[in-house]
Amino acid sequence: HVKYHVDDPEELAMINYTSGTTGFSKGVMLPYRALWGNLDYLIDSVKPHIGKNCNILSTLPMAHMYGLMTEFLFNIVLGNHIFFLTRLPSPTLISEALSEIKPDILYAVPLVVDKIVRKEVFPHIQTNRARLLMNMPVINKRIKEKVREFVLRKFGERPYEVVVGGAPLNKEIENFFISVGFPIAMGYGTTETAPLITFAHQDNYVAGSCGVAVKHMEVKVLSDDPENVAGELVCRGINVMKGYYKNQEATDAVIDKDGWFHTGDLATMDADGHFFVRGRSKNMLLGPNGQNIYPEEIEDKLNSMAMVNESIVIQSDDKLVALVHPDMEEVNNLGFTDEDLENIMEQNRKELNMQIPSFAKVSRIKLHNQEFEKTAKKSIKRYLYQNAI
């Protein structure tokens, strides 16, 4: 008798490893149903807008589920043209590739989007004349349309939308995109969900939100008052993994008896089902009277300030200290001395503390000469710097 293969949605499709942001990587066992669940959502929500025979520029690592699903598997299914970079991606290389390939949709991490906007866009539109024109009600709309067209050219002219995932988008960049009507989208997920949990396309984008639950997934916040008090974001559905490879203890720690996967992320949820991730529960710090401090929110503000390339906020002896890697290219271009840089950072610290609650004030800024070590999805490996003071 001939034995034919019987399709089983629970069959193991792949083992993908977590990015290791908070520690060692774990092997995530993803069944075919999880891959299908993600593809079914993308086909429903993205395919009608981009169709077939599109150009896709791959800027994300294929070893990470975000890139593997959105850039590779989804577009293989659609039969699109995928262009791979032949060198390690840098903002300059990506900018060149965008202008040449003109992708129909772009998937990226916030770091890349941030660099393109700050290097290629802001220097042209943050002149006194441009600011004056954008603030004049009579011509404001026309100017913003021109700015939108200019920004689109920097992202390849014709993307249906630019999808940001892997980490939150910087608030300054996000507000700029919204103000000029740029087609920004946001996805949120984990390796354990292959990867999508929530998504916001440009037509239902809400500032600060990572979107609403995707098709096939239930998502909720474990809080008595989820609109105002952050709780852990949990999800359940066909996108969820089978478990961690040869690690039942770790599996049981994140998937409860009712099938809910515990992400470890703290979030709130508004009345319309939009989720707002505040930070990782493992990263959350406690203020002097037990207040919750989310270092990611402080870092987001600090990263928009003068001469700051990236930062990490850590706690040392009950005080908050910001480790800052300066934008050395800008520092050198302007001819700043070490003393100049120290003075700028102190001014940054004072401005930062005016924008945040008193219990979350940063006591000092310490300069970090090298870029912080990152995962494949460009998230800083925070655990390496907890004892850096």
What residue spans do the PLM features occupy?
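Conserved AMP-binding A3 loop
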Residues: 13-39
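Conserved ATP-binding/catalytic segment of the ANL
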Residues: 220, 227-287, 304
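Adenylate-forming
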Residues: 240, 274-303, 329-340, 356-362, ...
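Conserved pre-ATP/AMP-binding loop-to-beta segment of ANL
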Residues: 1-17, 24, 49-55
